[in-house]
A protein has these predicted regions:
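Ligand-binding loop in jelly-roll beta-barrel domains
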Residues: 86-112
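Structural motif
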Residues: 64-66, 73, 89, 99
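Histidine-centered metal-chelating micro-motifs
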Residues: 45-47, 66, 82, 86-92
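A short, N-terminal "cap"/entry segment at the start of jelly-roll beta-barrel domains
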Residues: 1-32, 47, 114-126
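Glycine- and acidic-residue-biased ligand/ion/polar-headgroup-sensing regions
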Residues: 54-65
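Conserved short histidine dyad/triad with adjacent acidic residue
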Residues: 36-51
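Short acidic-glycine-tyrosine-enriched beta hairpin
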Residues: 71-86
């Protein structure tokens, strides 16, 4: 069994957010999916972007966000799951007073050349 702790995850600092690369081809050898824990500071967001050939699922753990997918906006809070279809454009803003935290799962895993916000360099696990 392969596991990874949040404290040990590769961390990407964006403007107003932190992305923890949890399960992916490099960390656990996954072939069909990758996942992240994402933290967004109050008032900050993640700009609109696409995930190329990947389908995405988001599950909100803490906080509130305004999420826009292909021009449709929704308010999400803890316990909400969001589906992002293949080829869709997504952006979000933390509209709560505290940190927004969510899990993002993508299938298939994508390379950084497709989505610099969340991609990885596809390589074999060490």
């Amino acid at each position: 069994m392969k596991t990874i702790q949040l404290a040990d995850a590769e961390k990407l600092e964006g403007t107003g957010y932190t992305l923890y690369r949890m399960l992916n081809p490099a960390t656990v050898g996954s072939k069909k999916f990758m996942s992240f824990v994402v933290e967004v500071h109050p008032g900050s967001g993640i700009p609109e972007h696409t995930h190329g050939p990947a389908e995405v699922g988001l599950h909100v753990l803490d906080g509130e966000a305004s999420v826009t997918i292909d021009g449709q906006e929704a308010l999400v809070k803890p316990g909400t799951a969001v589906h992002v279809p293949i080829g869709s454009t997504i952006g979000l803003t933390n509209v709560g007073e505290g940190a927004l935290r969510f899990i993002a799962a993508l299938s298939p895993p994508i390379d950084v050349s497709i989505c610099p916000v969340c991609g990885i360099e596809i390589r074999e696990p060490e």
